[in-house]
Swiss-Prot record:
It comes from the Bacteria. This is S-adenosylmethionine synthase. Pathway: Amino-acid biosynthesis; S-adenosyl-L-methionine biosynthesis; S-adenosyl-L-methionine from L-methionine: step 1/1. Homotetramer; dimer of dimers. Mg(2+) binds at D19. Its main location: cytoplasm. L-methionine binds at E58, Q101, D252, K283. It is an enzyme of class 2 (transferase). It is found in: Cytoplasm.
Amino acid sequence: MTYNKRLFTSESVTEGHPDKIADQVSDAILDEILKDDPNARVACETTVTTGMALISGEISTTTYVDIPKVVRETIKDIGYTRAKYGYDSQTMAVLTAIDEQSPDIAQGVDKALEYRNDISEEEIEATGAGDQGLMFGYATDETDTYMPLPIFLSHQLAKRLADVRKDEILDYLRPDGKVQVTVEYGEDDKPRRIDTIVVSTQHAEDVELAQIEKDIKTHVIYPTVDKALLDDETKFYINPTGRFVIGGPQGDAGLTGRKIIVDTYGGYARHGGGCFSGKDPTKVDRSAAYAARYVAKNIVAAGLAKQCEVQLAYAIGVAEPVSISINTFDTGKVSEARLVEAVRKHFDLRPAGIIKMLDLKQPIYRQTAAYGHFGRTDVLLPWEKLDKVNVLKDAVEIQ
């Protein structure tokens, strides 16, 4: 029997990928600052390359952080602890070039008094966005995590790849790695099977490719992927170049913010272009993208749509979003206009309102910097809450 089908592919990378090292370092520095100064302004950029890391950006804070120490501890946690891995947390150089936040930006954000948990309505209204921009959030009912299956499985496989290395199940693996999953969708637009899985993993020099292929299937793919999604036609490409010994920052330079599609929905939904890592929550690139996911997930969980994409947009120095747009891809039970009306009423999408609503001044960001910011099953994140489901149902009068 033949049927119309489509294929969709997403990718993820391990915590040892150069760009993800940079993201984790930037967010580790952010967390360390927020522990003592939740009102800090942080825009921290990291560059990693052979033998060194460069930390740059703008930071305004009342606390002191030993940045080289944070950098070294983060890279050690990832697993780059020996020179033979091409990157050693203890012997690498750490350079810093940090400035304060521009006063021109600060005057647009800081109209309110210093942030407090009991921030008043007047203070919320007086706190403008830190930049202009547009942000997207998305949710779908095709998985229990309300994430598209290709990116969900890519993250699960990438995380498992790191776990078997750290637990020494496969002690010849090294920290760098990438995963790609192609899912076949049927006429009902639901996942039917996995068409292709690609795994590229850094490894010790003395391991044969046949051994790597066997071990990755046995210890990474089969324990992670539902066997019902695999069949005789599923294709596996494991280290398809045949060799992946040189990796990490020795193989490629890494930069904060270069894995924005990995961080979000794997290309399944649109992206506003701004990255997350290294940014404190006054930056709407981060906080509004989290809020948009929060809105979209609650709409889908409420049964008001099978898919939902939310766009928010802001002007620098202005508190209210300049636009809220919702697209349910013809799966909505009510009009998109009614959903927008309900969202405006029940979600505070002003920058300070988002921070208060999602409690974003906490040092929670390092854990988001690898394996995705959304749909996580291993950590609890405030924008993944489903506490607005009944509120939304009541707002649009759906029982």
